[in-house]
Regions:
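Hydrophobic alpha-helical membrane segments of integral membrane proteins
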Residues: 48-91, 128-187
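C-terminal membrane module of polytopic membrane proteins
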Residues: 170-230
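Membrane-interfacial helix-loop-helix
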Residues: 2-10, 17-54, 94-151, 158-161, ...
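Ubiquitous "structural anchor" signal
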Residues: 74-77, 89, 100, 104, ...
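Alpha-helical transmembrane segments of multipass membrane proteins
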Residues: 13-18, 61, 65, 96, ...
């Protein structure tokens, strides 16, 4: 139970957020035309520039500023809507993750290794010599919110995983998490679609948790089997 604690806490936070929003009625503040008018008008009148500025913010925020991953999905959903916003977020965070990977591999290897060693579980899981487990490990760490997004990106840079495999896996396995936060944000902002958005988000969260835990158990089984064969 202890090893799933962070994932369960994450799910609990989402549920509490939904309940508090219903009780405290945060949505009117977020949907107040006076608060959003300037931003929405700017995006509408400067759509291409808005996309460019968002991508720059996301790439820099993910690779240099070490902002929490959820930040980028929330901002994208608020600016562009949940679905197209998810796409822009996925593009930006993938580029940011790859940039972090490259910085770690070619410029910051020694310092990053010392930093990653402080997170025992991440260090143990990520640093595997068996290349057959690389995509499985990448899937687990992306699906389960138990490791810091930015630290993961730098950690993979000092492993043996290829940049092609890392890029493809990162792009694919970040999709569920980005959609969750994007539609969750839409549910808070848009009163009419709130219930449906929260239901979709909750279903995806549950599926992610189930799949992530299953994959983690599979990883532990394969690791134990490999050790026994030695």
């Amino acid at each position: 139970m202890k090893k799933y604690r962070k994932a369960l806490i994450f799910i609990l936070i989402i549920i509490i957020g939904v309940i508090l929003n219903r009780k405290l009625q945060w949505s009117p503040y977020l949907t107040d035309s006076n608060n959003l008018k300037i931003i929405t008008n700017f995006v509408r009148n400067n759509y291409i520039l808005s996309i460019f500025l968002y991508l720059v913010f996301t790439i820099v925020g993910a690779s240099i500023l070490a902002l929490p991953g959820v930040t980028f999905a929330v901002v994208a959903s608020g600016l562009f809507g949940p679905w197209i916003g998810s796409l822009y977020c996925l593009i930006g965070t993938t580029i940011g993750a790859v940039l972090s990977f490259l910085l770690s591999r070619y410029l910051l290897k020694n310092s990053i290794e010392e930093l990653v060693k402080k997170n025992d579980r991440l260090y143990t899981i990520v640093f595997q010599t068996d290349s057959k487990k690389e995509m499985l490990i990448l899937m687990i760490t992306r699906l389960l919110p138990i490791f810091p997004f930015n630290l993961q990106n730098y950690a993979y840079g000092i492993t043996n995983i290829s940049i092609v495999k890392y890029t493809i896996g990162t792009f694919l396995f970040m999709i569920p998490g980005i959609i969750i936060f994007s539609i969750g944000t839409e549910g808070i902002i848009n009163v009419e679609s709130r219930n449906s958005m929260f239901i979709i988000a909750l279903v995806i969260i549950i599926l992610m948790a189930i799949i992530g835990i299953y994959l983690y158990k599979k990883y532990k089984t394969l690791t134990a089997r490999g050790q026994n064969e030695r």
